[in-house]
């Protein structure tokens, strides 16, 4: 595990998991990597949340279906729901957005307010709730409370995840600038480029 963008693994990789605190930019990075390496991006939130935010019964079957394909990138989440046990053995690269709390917090506030104001559809007809929900202390009802509750999850969980999955290459990115520099270095590295 190295920190300098020039010394980080450059790939390309065929199956990628992106870990990080809620709001850190996992989905945004997944889209960027999908474009850089010609991978299929499957957003786990779209598989998990059915209409009216009800969890879909077919979630794990859907995860297993796309995980069995050869080329994908997705967010490393829903591990407590069983997705980790399906995705981790197949993945080749784990990218960990280990950003400072204030960076992820600012990004999540901006994203939540924007989604709430625009009422943009997220997944399966669902939309961000009222901004008044941000005053609720229940992490199941307030994404900011959820972020606070889970803020140390990856720092606690990553060592065990890597021990369970010694085949994974890890790229740990500690700032958006470091992420941008790493992604910029991927330009021109197609799926057929030498690794």
Region spans (language model):
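Hydrophobic anchor at the beta1->P-loop junction of P-loop NTPases
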Residues: 18
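Conserved lysine of the Walker
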Residues: 26
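Active-site signature of alpha/beta-hydrolase-fold catalytic machinery across serine-
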Residues: 32
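Conserved nucleotide-sensing/catalytic segment adjacent to the nucleotide-binding pocket
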Residues: 40-99
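A glycine- and Lys/Arg-enriched "phosphate-lid" helix/loop adjacent to the NTP-binding pocket
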Residues: 99-153, 192-194
């Amino acid at each position: 595990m190295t920190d300098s963008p020039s010394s980080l693994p450059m790939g390309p990789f065929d199956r990628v998991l992106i870990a990080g605190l809620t709001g850190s930019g996992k989905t945004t990075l997944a889209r960027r990597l999908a474009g850089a390496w010609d991978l299929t991006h499957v957003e786990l939130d779209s598989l998990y949340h059915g209409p009216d935010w009800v969890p879909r019964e077919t979630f794990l079957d859907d995860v297993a279906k796309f995980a069995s394909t050869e080329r994908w990138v997705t967010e490393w989440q829903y591990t407590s729901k069983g997705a980790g046990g399906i995705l981790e053995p197949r993945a080749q690269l784990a990218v960990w957005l280990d950003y400072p709390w204030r960076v992820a917090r600012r990004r999540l506030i901006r994203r939540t307010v924007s989604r709430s104001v625009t009422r943009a559809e997220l997944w399966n007809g669902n939309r961000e709730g009222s901004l008044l929900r941000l005053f609720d202390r229940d992490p199941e009802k307030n994404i900011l409370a959820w972020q606070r509750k889970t803020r140390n999850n990856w720092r606690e969980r990553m060592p065990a995840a890597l021990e369970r999955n010694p085949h994974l290459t890890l790229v740990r990115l500690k700032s958006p600038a470091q992420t941008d520099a790493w992604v910029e270095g991927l330009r021109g590295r197609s799926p057929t480029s030498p690794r």
